[in-house]
């Protein structure tokens, strides 16, 4: 999990900057990595403030669409969203915003680990109402990474902030999975990927995904 002096990150292999200074085209480049088919939403992107904003926008739009369809059909069946996640991770603050979006919706979001989900992506996936993993998918859980520069006092404050955020992340894993404190401490300092069977055993996922 990575951070710089402005944002804190949880990513598989890369450090990112979170400043939005790069020139962008008019169309949101993240839209092509996030799309909807029926009640399935596919997210294949690094987790950034922009991709998180786009994903939350799509989730809210899909919620409205599904509720309208349910009312129109006079259906007593609770509509559900299936979120397929493929990501190397990214900004942990952005991951938190997606979790809060889940909680604000009136219909459940089921998460599907598709191919690979790492770091901040796992924080999202374990918050699904039902949590699935594809047979050949892998998950990476590891600790925060950070880098900063400046005055000693600023560096000290950044370190304290990172400790606070890491404690927050640790508690999420302990609350949402079957991972023990001892084992969490072991895997956070490593970069060892977990397969589908291990994820189910550890409570990171509930079951193998079968196409809905």
Positions of predicted regions on the chain:
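Terminal-region recognition feature
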Residues: 1-212
